Amino acid sequence: MPRVKKAVKSRERRKKILKLAKGYRGGRGKLIRSASETVDRALKFAYRDRKTRKRQFRSLWIMRINAAAREHDLSYSRFMHALKKANIDMDRKALAHLAVNDPAAFAKLARIAKEAA
């Protein structure tokens, strides 16, 4: 069998890890073992938090819609139910954007929701 030299692949693998560890302090950015552990942990957190971010934004949108709806004497759940009855199909992101940036348009939606309820 021919002799296999893995220097190129090993160097590529280590360079890839050190590139991901760029900016880390001390040995975590220079030493391959420390960098590898830290990068693995960072990637695990990044994966987990990409999922968490979706939940957090949905929660934020609901809070904003609820606050704006309560200014018009509606709770969040009654507001959303009334919008569904009025056949207004807007997602929470758009409703939250209206609540923050265009209160007049949100007031119209609240009025429609009150009529539908």
UniProtKB/Swiss-Prot annotation:
Stored CDD domains: Ribosomal_L20
Protein's name according to its UniProt entry: Large ribosomal subunit protein bL20
Family per record: Belongs to the bacterial ribosomal protein bL20 family.
Origin species: Syntrophobacter fumaroxidans (strain DSM 10017 / MPOB)
Keyword Isomerase: no
GO terms for biological process, alphabetical: ribosomal large subunit assembly; translation
Lineage: Bacteria, Pseudomonadati, Thermodesulfobacteriota, Syntrophobacteria, Syntrophobacterales
GO terms of molecular function: rRNA binding; structural constituent of ribosome
GO CC entries: ribonucleoprotein complex; ribosome
A Pfam family per the record: Ribosomal_L20
Listed NCBIfam families: rplT_bact
Superkingdom field: Bacteria
Gene: rplT
